[in-house]
Each structure stands twice: as structure tokens, then as C-alpha cells.
Amino acid sequence: MTEQRFTHLDDSGRAQMVDVTDKDITQRAATAQARVRMQPSTLQMILAGEHPKGDVLATARIAGIQAAKKTWDLIPLCHPLLLTGITVTIEPEADDALCVQATCKLKGTTGVEMEALTAASVACLTLYDMCKAVDRCMVIESVCLLEKSGGRSGTFRRER
């Protein structure tokens, strides 16, 4: 078994941006997920399009897309990436939650896991922000990477 190490630390333990100069360009994709739990009445208001702030779901999707593009600005050691695809979906779950899934794609030398995780997280934060006036008990939960493909480490799929 090969020794695992933190790639963002140099031999002296100092933070560094990983050098991907010599890595092969491959097709890469990642999908992340997060949930916002809320009062059933809040979810019904959103789904019926009756929220006073307008289309909550469209705003959250756009926020997630923007967040994926700005990940390198938010997470200090992330590379600026030329993403070729970003999809954010938001679906109701039971009577008290919205499930956000974000998928990011590119052809490049580094993965897009952080971009997908950031997109899902910020979409949930936007849902919270837009709905906090009517429901302060919301909970953002279960932020996780569902799958990734491409690159040296191959494919990962979370067991559901």
C-alpha cells in the first residue's frame, strides 16, 4: 500500500498549491449533494411559487453555478479552472426538505470535486438566506461528494 499524504502540504508541512503542470489532461466530473430541511409549510410556499422574494429555486440554482465558477476565489489552494459544464438541480424530498445536486465537468489536469461541493453548499446557503424570514429552523445537512471520475485516482462512487 502506498503511503497517503496531504498533497497541499510541502515536506516541511507548509501549505502549497499542488503543481499540476505535468499531469495529463483528462475528462473530469464530480457530483456533490446537500440538503436543506425546513418546515413543511416553507417547502410548500417555495414549490407553489408563493414566496415573497420570488423564484427561490431559480435563484439558488444560479447561486450554485456562480459559486462553482468562483471556488478558486473562496478556497485558498484551489486552482482556477475552465469549467465546461455546471448543472445544479433542486428537488423536494419528503415534505420537509430540498435536495441539491451539483455536477461540474471539465477537460483538465485537476479534479472538480471542490467546485461541485461549493456549488451544492452555496445553493443551500441561498435557499436558507431567501427563506430565513419565514423559517429560522432550517438546517443545512449532508453535504457530500457523491461521485467523481477522471484523473489518476480514477472513479469514486459513494454508496447510498
From Swiss-Prot:
Subunit (UniProt): Homohexamer; trimer of dimers.
Natural source organism: Alcanivorax borkumensis (strain ATCC 700651 / DSM 11573 / NCIMB 13689 / SK2)
Family label: Belongs to the MoaC family.
PANTHER family, per the entry: CYCLIC PYRANOPTERIN MONOPHOSPHATE SYNTHASE (PTHR22960:SF29), MOLYBDOPTERIN COFACTOR SYNTHESIS PROTEIN A (PTHR22960)
Claim: NADP is one of the keywords in the record: no
Active site: 129
Reactions the enzyme catalyzes: (8S)-3',8-cyclo-7,8-dihydroguanosine 5'-triphosphate = cyclic pyranopterin phosphate + diphosphate
E.C. numbers: 4.6.1.17
Gene Ontology MF terms: cyclic pyranopterin monophosphate synthase activity
Chain positions recorded as substrate binding sites: 77-79, 114-115
Pfam family, one: MoaC
Keywords, alphabetical: Lyase, Molybdenum cofactor biosynthesis
NCBIfam families, per the entry: moaC, PRK09364.1
Pathway the protein acts in: Cofactor biosynthesis; molybdopterin biosynthesis
The protein, known as: Cyclic pyranopterin monophosphate synthase
Domain of life of the source: Bacteria
UniProt-listed InterPro entries: MoaC, MoaC_bact/euk, MoaC_sf, MoCo_biosynth_MoaA/MoaC, Mopterin_CF_biosynth-C_dom
Keyword Lyase: yes
Gene3D superfamilies xrefs: Molybdopterin cofactor biosynthesis C (MoaC) domain (3.30.70.640)
Biological process, per Gene Ontology: Mo-molybdopterin cofactor biosynthetic process
Task performed by this protein: Catalyzes the conversion of (8S)-3',8-cyclo-7,8-dihydroguanosine 5'-triphosphate to cyclic pyranopterin monophosphate (cPMP).
